[in-house]
Amino acid sequence: MDSILVKGNGELRGQIPIAGAKNACLALMPATLLSDEPLTLTNAPRLSDIRTMTQLLQSLGAEVASLQGGQVLALSSHALTDHRADYDIVRKMRASILVLGPMLARDGHAVVSLPGGCAIGARPVDLHLKALEAMGAELDLRDGYIHAKAPAGGLKGARVVFPLVSVGATENALMAATLAKGTTVLENAAREPEIVDLARCLRRMGAQIEGEGSSTITIEGVDRLGGATHPVVTDRIELGTYMLAPAICGGEVELLGGRIELVGAFCEKLDAAGISVEETERGLRVARKNGRVKAVDVMTEPFPGFPTDLQAQMMALLCTAEGTSVLEERIFENRFMHAPELIRMGARIEVHGGTATVTGVEKLRGAPVMATDLRASVSLILAGLAAEGETIVSRVYHLDRGYERVEEKLSACGAQIRRIPG
């Protein structure tokens, strides 16, 4: 099993290209199931989760070709051979549930295993299922599988009110509604850029959608969808992660492809901590203003609030801030599993339920640490960049699910980091 060796060595300077968004691409790929015409995705990230979704779609009979080194995906679902998404593939990734809505909408039936993925508390699929039931689907959960069937004549437009904001449930309902009979209104819908990106792609395919980016999305069902070519939106979580690298280490880094509107709430916290963020012709330039970072309080919220997927990385920054910071996690439970590993490096962190209190220290110390999930793994790498001595991060298979060539991108800016094959 691979590990990452990091040596803290001061400032970073250079440029880092930001890839297409993993979470956007994982929703865009199942959209091919809505049409029998080709869908081409450009600016696709080259990640293990994308390969897992490729395997899942191919198991259903879809064709998926990876072109230009994986940056272009050519998909076609003109002849599905199966409507059963098996546990062996689905268990690897929670986004697998996103094949349910498209298959149900196009062909009227689907069998999908309950999903797996990151070990971050309870992430139930109830909201997905209730949305589809509102459109008339009959659902039966047995033997670890969701057995879904559309009513005669197909899914029907409906008013769907999400009791909680859910990106995945919004995506599943949005895709299903494009082929439903009549009008569907999604209320308390997720507003994330990945939702906007999916809606734009579906519109290119012929869907009639209004309101994406707001909490109310209206979809007028159509008889069929066609093909399209669509660029995947920039990955705002990768962007935010690499913005934190010069914030932690000092120096100045330009993030190519970065856009301020993708990370607005995050940038506000960086500014309060003493980090400069400037727009450039090619992206964003980030630098630490003067001296030690200042403590700030952070509360995770659905977009446009502070993203939960940047909470672990932000904690790494605040470990060496001047003063005491409070981080409140309001999206997922059990999402401070990185805290004990940061404590091994000398951080002062107290966790009580969904709140972590971080008292900044002047310096972290390198140590062997273990990644527990995707975002925790990169937070430990960031901490290692600012620590004295060597840090070895084990179980970095988590990292490869969401970050493309992390050691190459950081080393290009002067970081001493390398992968140790396991």
Curated annotation (Swiss-Prot):
Binding site for phosphoenolpyruvate: 22-23
Pathway annotation from the record: Cell wall biogenesis; peptidoglycan biosynthesis
Sites where the protein binds UDP-N-acetyl-alpha-D-glucosamine: 94, 123-127, 309, 331
Cellular compartment(s): Cytoplasm
Cellular-component GO terms for this entry: cytoplasm
PTM-bearing positions, type 2-(S-cysteinyl)pyruvic acid O-phosphothioketal: 118
CDD domains named among the record's database cross-references: UdpNAET
UniProt xrefs under Gene3D superfamilies: Enolpyruvate transferase domain
Keyword set, alphabetical order: Cell cycle, Cell division, Cell shape, Cell wall biogenesis/degradation, Cytoplasm, Peptidoglycan synthesis, Pyruvate, Transferase
GO biological process terms held by the UniProt record: cell division; cell wall organization; peptidoglycan biosynthetic process; regulation of cell shape; UDP-N-acetylgalactosamine biosynthetic process
UniProt keyword Amino-acid biosynthesis present: no
GO MF entry, a single one: UDP-N-acetylglucosamine 1-carboxyvinyltransferase activity
Reactions performed catalytically: phosphoenolpyruvate + UDP-N-acetyl-alpha-D-glucosamine = UDP-N-acetyl-3-O-(1-carboxyvinyl)-alpha-D-glucosamine + phosphate
Keyword rRNA-binding: no
Active site: 118 (proton donor)
Matches recorded under SUPFAM superfamilies: EPT/RTPC-like
Enzyme kind, highest EC tier: transferase
InterPro entries the UniProt entry points to: Enolpyruvate_Tfrase_dom, Enolpyruvate_Tfrase_sf, MurA_subfamily, RNA3'P_cycl/enolpyr_Trfase_a/b, UDP_GlcNAc_COvinyl_MurA
EC number(s) recorded for this UniProt protein: 2.5.1.7
Family: Belongs to the EPSP synthase family. MurA subfamily.
Function text: Cell wall formation. Adds enolpyruvyl to UDP-N-acetylglucosamine.
Protein name in UniProt: UDP-N-acetylglucosamine 1-carboxyvinyltransferase
Organism: Cereibacter sphaeroides (strain KD131 / KCTC 12085) (Rhodobacter sphaeroides)
